[in-house]
Amino acid sequence: MGVPLHEQGDWIREVADLGYTDVWSSEADGADGFTPLALASVWAPSLRLGSAIVPAFTRGPATMAQCVAALADAAPGRVAFGIGTSSNVIVERWNDIPFEQPYQRTRDMVRFLRAAVAGAKVRETYETFTVDGFKLSQ
C-alpha cells in the first residue's frame, strides 16, 4: 500500500524542491489517474503532470473529456495525458465492461478527445461508440 493521498503534499513539494520536473499517475487498483495529479498541481505548481496510463474503457467519452479538460484547466500547459487499452482484468473483471476492440476503442477515444478538448460540439459515430452533441463548457 502506498502513501495515502492526504499525506502526499509534503512529499510532492520535496520532489519539486529536489529538482524533479514531472510527476506521473497511473490507474489500476488504487486512486484514479486524475485525482493525484490535481492535488499535485496545487502542492507543486512547477511540476509537469502526466497520466500513465488511463484506460480508454472505464469512463465514457464525455466523462473522460471532462477529466482531461479539468486537469488541463487546473494546470495550464503542464499536462501530458496518456491513454491506453488497459487489460481484460481491469476492464472486464473489475468493471464489467466488455474488453472488445481495444485498439479501436483507444483510437476512437483519442479522436473524440482531440475534438472535444479543442472546443468542438461532437456529433460522431465512431467504430466503438457514438457521441451525440457533447460540448465542453469552458
Predicted segments — roles?
Residues 36-46, 62-68, 96:
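Glycine-rich loop at the start of a catalytic domain that most often binds anionic cofactors/ligands
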